[in-house]
């Protein structure tokens, strides 16, 4: 009787092992990949030219970051300014993964920022991601 009961137990054990083999892997920690592999061509300028509908000077920042796949969304978020005159500004690069499956190919991705600023002159801009400095822009010209 015990021998007859053994095959269903073995079958249940085999089925549970097969199902656990189908479990998904935990999402990979891409580490610095979420901040990109490399970045380049960072530029910033202040447009202080007067005009209709303008509420003051506008700060523009552009750059390019190599991301691990196509479809990443990159956003610059303004942080604190230091107390020097002219001030230095800090920005944090926020990244958002693409949804669904994507091709695994390093993709240069453009970053753009354009917002009104209260500063007519800026000494430097430091861009960080994941707590590390990604880029420092020392030359921020002003267009009058």
Predicted regions and their residues:
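Bacterial N-terminal signal peptides that target proteins for export
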Residues: 1-11
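C-terminal motif of bacterial Sec signal peptides marking the signal peptidase cleavage site
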Residues: 18-21
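Bacterial signal peptide processing site
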Residues: 23-25
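Short, surface-exposed binding/anchoring microloops in extracellular/periplasmic proteins
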Residues: 37-81
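C-terminal partner/receptor-binding element of secreted or periplasmic proteins
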Residues: 39, 107-144
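A short, structured loop/turn motif at beta-sheet edges
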Residues: 54-56, 79-89, 116-121
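A mature extracytoplasmic/lumenal domain signature
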Residues: 65, 78-80, 93-97, 117-119, ...
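An anionic, turn-rich surface loop/hairpin at beta-sheet edges
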Residues: 89-119
């Amino acid at each position: 009787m015990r021998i007859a009961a053994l095959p269903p137990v073995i079958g249940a054990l085999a089925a549970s092992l097969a199902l656990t083999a189908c479990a998904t892997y935990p999402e990979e920690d891409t580490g610095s990949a979420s901040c990109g592999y490399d970045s380049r061509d960072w530029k910033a300028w202040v447009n202080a030219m007067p005009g209709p509908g303008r509420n003051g000077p506008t700060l523009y920042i552009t750059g390019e970051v190599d991301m691990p796949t196509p479809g990443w969304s990159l956003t610059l978020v303004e942080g604190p300014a230091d107390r020097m005159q002219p001030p230095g500004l800090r920005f944090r690069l926020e990244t958002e993964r693409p949804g669904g499956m994507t091709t695994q190919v390093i993709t240069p991705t453009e970053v753009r920022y354009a917002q009104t600023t209260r500063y007519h002159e800026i000494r430097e801009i430091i861009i960080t991601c994941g707590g590390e400095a990604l880029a420092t822009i020392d030359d921020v010209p002003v267009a009058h």
